[in-house]
């Protein structure tokens, strides 16, 4: 009996703290409301494993085992077409999507994605990467000129379901902003949730937040050793087009708005940042 108890405690000890993706997240636009969209984004965030919280914001893992690296968003359009979108939990990037027996991968998708995701499908590599510059070039449009909103998301799902090569880049821009970016920023989530029946063009505040997530994440982390002050200010733009700087964690841009922090340990050249991460015990997960 004692041996069994000890074994049980050992198993529990091994698994406590090991990050896991909690499963797929579903969203059906045919019955969507502002409330169900908000719940979808909240559920999406909740599936993402994190190291610890920094100023009450989850800090994503920089490295995680292949088996836990991706989660799926199952999205259904107004016309009941469903695609499964694969998200990398280390950075909330869209890496691939599946429609029926075919799957499509961004050009820079990690090798693990090809090995793990959508087995049994015919895998196609898209002729562009998933970054905004590449997608806007492929779409022949900038984000400011592409509609967002739940109707736009439904149309994007339909485009991707049937894979219209000409329209796919724009559809992917809609998909990324209404899912991944909304998970990162409460401001974007709330903006999309207002547009259940109509669409909108993203304002400059949305675009600048999307562009500066990495910079904001890094400065929020570094602020722990600087009394909440940023080492370097982060430039953003207001909806009116006015430019301003975020200089500390007490800013409204940070508090209640940023919901996930990118862990830049793997890519930053700042040795102090890397050292601090190590001292805090953020470890590589195998």
Swiss-Prot record:
Post-translational note: Bound to a branched hexasaccharide.
Pfam (any one): RIP
Disulfide bridge partners, by residue number: none
GO biological process, one term: negative regulation of translation
One Gene Ontology MF term: rRNA N-glycosylase activity
Leader sequence segment: 1-23
Matches recorded under PROSITE patterns: SHIGA_RICIN (PS00275)
SUPFAM superfamilies noted in UniProt: Ribosome inactivating proteins (RIP)
Keywords carried by this UniProt record: Antiviral protein, Glycoprotein, Hydrolase, Plant defense, Protein synthesis inhibitor, Signal, Toxin
Positions bearing carbohydrate: 74
EC number: 3.2.2.22
Chemical reaction(s) catalysed: Endohydrolysis of the N-glycosidic bond at one specific adenosine on the 28S rRNA
Active site: 93, 132, 181, 184
Its job: Irreversibly relaxes supercoiled DNA and catalyzes double-stranded breakage. Also acts as a ribosome inactivating protein.
Other comments on record: Possesses anti-HIV and antitumoral activities. Inhibits HIV-1 integrase.
Family: Belongs to the ribosome-inactivating protein family. Type 1 RIP subfamily.
Name by which UniProt lists this protein: Ribosome-inactivating protein beta-momorcharin
Recorded name of the encoding gene: MAP30
């Amino acid at each position: 009996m004692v041996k069994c108890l000890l074994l049980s405690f050992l198993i529990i000890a091994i698994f406590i703290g090991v990050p896991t993706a909690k499963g797929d997240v579903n969203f059906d636009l045919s019955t969507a409301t502002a409330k169900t969209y908000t719940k979808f984004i909240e559920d999406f965030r909740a599936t993402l494993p994190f190291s610890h919280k920094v100023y009450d914001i989850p800090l994503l893992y920089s490295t995680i085992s292949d088996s836990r690296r991706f989660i799926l968003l199952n999205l259904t359009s107004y016309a009941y077409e469903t695609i499964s979108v694969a998200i990398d939990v280390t950075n909330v990037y869209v890496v691939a999507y599946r429609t029926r027996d075919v799957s499509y991968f961004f050009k820079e998708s990690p090798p693990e994605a090809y090995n793990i995701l959508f087995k049994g499908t015919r895998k196609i590599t898209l002729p562009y990467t998933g970054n905004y510059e590449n997608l806007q070039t492929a779409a022949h449009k900038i984000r400011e000129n592409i509609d967002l909103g739940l109707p736009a998301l439904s149309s994007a799902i339909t485009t991707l379901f049937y894979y219209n090569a000409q329209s796919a880049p724009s559809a992917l821009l809609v998909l990324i902003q209404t899912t991944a970016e909304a998970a990162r920023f409460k401001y974007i989530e709330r903006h999309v949730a207002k547009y259940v029946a109509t669409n909108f063009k993203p304002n400059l505040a949305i675009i600048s937040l999307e562009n500066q997530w990495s910079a904001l994440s890094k400065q929020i982390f570094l602020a722990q050793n600087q009394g909440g002050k940023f080492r370097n200010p982060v430039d953003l733009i207001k909806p009116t087009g006015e430019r301003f700087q975020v200089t500390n964690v007490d800013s409204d841009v940070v508090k209640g708005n940023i919901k996930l922090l990118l862990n830049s340990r793997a890519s930053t050249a700042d040795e102090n940042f890397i050292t601090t991460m190590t001292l805090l015990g953020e470890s590589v997960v195998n």
